[in-house]
């Protein structure tokens, strides 16, 4: 937990910096408007040539709209064929790692098919939704690798998912406002850090699995069984409640789903969906518009708070951790919810699955890789579908392209889950999931960062506007 506390301190510093930057930006913008009124009466005061004001002029011009969508025609050509192949493998590996595959989808949509970056972000979310739905359906029957519980940890999802959806709404708005160069910088820093952490966690898990295999071989050799006949089974994180019964790997969906927790998650999704639809006929930045947006906060905080209080009081536990430390402090619970919001913001802003944040976080909590991947994907199903609704209402993607690519991602995710599950059973290494997660995050950092840098250089050469967009004037 000390590592998590250090992460929290670092996160708090970054948050304070961003808040200070936002306040300074708002102050300077207001000051600039006031100066423009005074300059209209006294033309002799024309001192806006300072470096600071030039920077503000670069970052914000209220009448500038830099975004124009680029949607190529939907027709059979080499771009579609190559994009389909790349999208298929991205969805297959992304669903296994619990990250969705957005880090592969966005560059593919931009570089190969030819969408503009923000439209690529929106279509990427559609593909993540398709892959997530397929993966969740595949996982609904599966059980925890060592404990007698579902492979999806519903209590963990109930703590994180409402805050994830709140973050998605913030991230979608930021996607409209933030310039591409800022998104690129944030992406590279965040993804390089999380991929490094995930790789280290994978190495640690690999070493533990090696020790477990050696111990199992020694025990069997002492009983007169050849070590070459050893089949690896993960050591249980907690004693089985039914030691005489062999744990089933698959059960019926009705038996395997925690319906109360699922009902609460669906309730949050429906409320958020209703709020998003109700904004459709409201003027951007009107009083009603902001009231509807702010109503999302009590819904998300209420449901996550309900689960957090139950965890704090010991009425609920994160059972997938096994018999480890199940007592949570207030600071830890607040930190986990904060990470949920950050994961949502990243997902909505970059068109990625929140699994890029949730996966490494769940692993740090001591959750097994299979459960981490399944639970992160389960939460992403709700958040990605909400993002798709929001992007659709903003008219950010062409429907025919989206339907086709959703179909590709849905099939690919099912294939990926099936193949990797058999591979893990064959080699006895669940750490394979963590290495896939780390690889997907790292590849995403390189591909998305590279695309962002190329686009940024192109805009500089064309002398295009590279500042913040105006959310209140955005019309799709």
UniProtKB/Swiss-Prot annotation:
UniProt subcellular location: Membrane
Alphabetically ordered keywords of this record: Membrane, Transmembrane, Transmembrane helix, Transport
GO CC entries: membrane
The keyword GTP-binding belongs to this UniProt entry's keyword annotation: no
Entry-linked Pfam families: TauE
N-terminal signal peptide: none
Keyword Translocase set for record: no
InterPro entries, A to Z: TM_pro_TauE-like (IPR002781)
Membrane-topology descriptor: Multi-pass membrane protein
Residues spanning the membrane: 8-28, 76-92, 99-115, 120-142, 151-171, 172-192, 257-277, 291-311, 339-359, 360-380, 397-417, 433-453
The family this protein is said to belong to: Belongs to the 4-toluene sulfonate uptake permease (TSUP) (TC 2.A.102) family.
Protein name stated in the entry: Sulfite exporter TauE/SafE family protein 3
Protein source organism: Arabidopsis thaliana (Mouse-ear cress)
């Amino acid at each position: 937990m000390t590592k998590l506390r250090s992460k929290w301190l670092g996160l708090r510093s970054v948050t304070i910096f961003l808040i200070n930057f936002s306040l300074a930006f708002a102050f300077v913008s207001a000051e600039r408007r006031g100066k423009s009124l005074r300059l209209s009466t006294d033309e002799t005061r024309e001192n806006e040539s300072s470096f600071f004001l030039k920077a503000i002029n670069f970052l914000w011009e209220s009448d500038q709209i830099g975004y124009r969508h680029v949607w190529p025609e939907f027709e059979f050509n080499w771009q579609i064929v190559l994009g389909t192949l790349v999208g298929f493998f991205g969805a297959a590996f992304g669903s296994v790692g619990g990250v969705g595959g957005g880090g592969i989808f966005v560059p593919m949509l931009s570089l190969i098919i030819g969408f503009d970056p923000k439209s690529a972000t929106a279509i990427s979310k559609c593909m993540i939704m398709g892959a997530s739905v397929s993966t969740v359906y595949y996982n609904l029957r599966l059980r925890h690798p060592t404990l007698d519980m579902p492979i999806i940890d519903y209590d963990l999802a109930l703590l994180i998912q409402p805050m994830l959806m709140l973050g998605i709404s913030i991230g979608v708005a930021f996607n409209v406002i933030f310039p591409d160069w800022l998104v690129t910088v944030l992406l590279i820093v965040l993804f390089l850090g999380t991929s490094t952490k995930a790789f280290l966690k994978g190495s640690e898990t690999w070493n533990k699995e090696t020790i477990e295999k050696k111990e199992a071989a020694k025990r069997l050799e002492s009983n007169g069984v050849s070590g070459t006949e050893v089949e690896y089974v993960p050591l249980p994180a907690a004693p089985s409640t039914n030691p005489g019964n062999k744990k089933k790997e698959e059960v019926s969906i009705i038996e395997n789903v925690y319906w109360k927790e699922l009902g609460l998650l669906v309730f949050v999704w429906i409320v958020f969906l209703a709020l998003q639809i109700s904004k459709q006929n409201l003027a951007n930045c009107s009083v009603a518009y902001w009231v509807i947006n702010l109503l999302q906060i009590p819904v998300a905080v209420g449901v996550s708070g309900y689960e957090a209080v139950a965890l704090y009081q010991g009425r609920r536990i994160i059972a997938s951790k096994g018999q480890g430390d199940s007592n949570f402090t207030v600071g830890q619970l607040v930190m986990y919810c904060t990470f949920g919001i950050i994961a949502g913001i990243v997902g909505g802003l970059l068109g990625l699955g929140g699994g890029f944040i949730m996966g490494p976080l769940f692993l740090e909590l001591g959750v097994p890789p299979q459960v981490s991947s399944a639970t992160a994907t389960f939460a992403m199903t709700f958040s990605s579908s909400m993002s798709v609704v929001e992007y659709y209402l903003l008219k950010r993607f062409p429907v025919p392209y989206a339907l086709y690519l959703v179909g590709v991602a849905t099939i690919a995710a099912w294939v990926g889950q099936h193949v990797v599950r058999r591979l893990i059973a064959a080699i006895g290494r669940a750490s394979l999931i963590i290495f896939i997660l780390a690889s997907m995050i790292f590849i995403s950092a390189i591909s998305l960062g590279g695309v962002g840098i190329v686009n940024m250089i192109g805009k500089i050469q064309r002398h295009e506007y590279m500042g913040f967009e105006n959310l209140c004037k955005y019309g799709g």
